[in-house]
Curated annotation (Swiss-Prot):
Name of the encoding gene: apt
Subcellular location: Cytoplasm
Keyword rRNA-binding on entry: no
Family membership: Belongs to the purine/pyrimidine phosphoribosyltransferase family.
Pfam families found in the cross-reference section: Pribosyltran (PF00156)
Role summary: Catalyzes a salvage reaction resulting in the formation of AMP, that is energically less costly than de novo synthesis.
Any one Gene Ontology cellular component term annotated for this protein: cytoplasm
GO biological process terms, semicolon-separated: adenine salvage; AMP salvage; purine ribonucleoside salvage
Name of this chain's protein: Adenine phosphoribosyltransferase
EC number: 2.4.2.7
GO MF annotation: an example: adenine binding
Length: 182
């Protein structure tokens, strides 16, 4: 599977805005809306992801709420694949299956429709989100996919906040690809 050159990574990273002290003091938020609003950069990113995954014989793209929906749905349209959302609790209207995960203080949960992959036996799936930090949501999502019996080919992120260790943690569950590592 293909990766970007250092020059191309610098180009994409330059289209992402840093917001200091958001959502709380001490945090530098990676705002991808500036990349999404730049038609050339967004197309470049999608061209790269399409090229990386076009020969993987995937059946579905799974996107993690909420910015994973943007990237995942766009990529699924490019690859002519179905898109399946991973949602926060009580957001899906049909019967769901869930996976809890730990937060610094407490727990959270992700859900999917229980029949999301019923149309294909042992589907090959790509998990997509905009960013991986500590990896809690991504790991819970990968565990949820395993409960549903899918073949998780890879988890793909636009940005990996490497020092927070999420991608390293997730590699115990599945292969991980990050377009940009910061």
């Amino acid at each position: 599977m293909k990766e970007l050159s250092k020059f191309d990574k610098e180009y994409l990273l330059g289209t992402i805005r840093d917001i200091k002290n958001f959502p709380k003091p001490g945090i530098i938020f990676k705002d991808i809306t500036t990349l999404l609003g730049n038609a050339k950069a967004f197309k470049f990113l999608l061209d790269h992801l399409e090229d990386r995954y076009k020969d993987e014989n995937l059946d579905f793209i799974v996107g993690i709420e909420s910015r994973g929906f943007i990237l995942g749905a766009a990529l699924s349209a490019r690859l002519n694949l179905g898109f399946v959302p991973v949602r926060k609790p009580n957001k899906l209207p049909y019967i769901t299956i869930s996976q809890k995960y730990s937060l610094e203080y407490g727990f959270d949960e992700v859900e999917m429709h229980i029949d999301a992959f019923d149309s294909i036996k042992n589907p090959k799936v790509l998990l997509v989100d905009d960013l991986i930090a500590t990896g809690g949501t991504a790991k819970a999502s990968s565990q949820l996919l395993k409960k549903l019996g899918v073949n998780l080919v890879e988890a793909c992120f636009l940005v990996d906040l490497v020092e927070l260790g999420g991608s390293k943690e997730l590699k115990s569950e599945c292969p991980v690809y990050s377009v940009l590592e910061v």
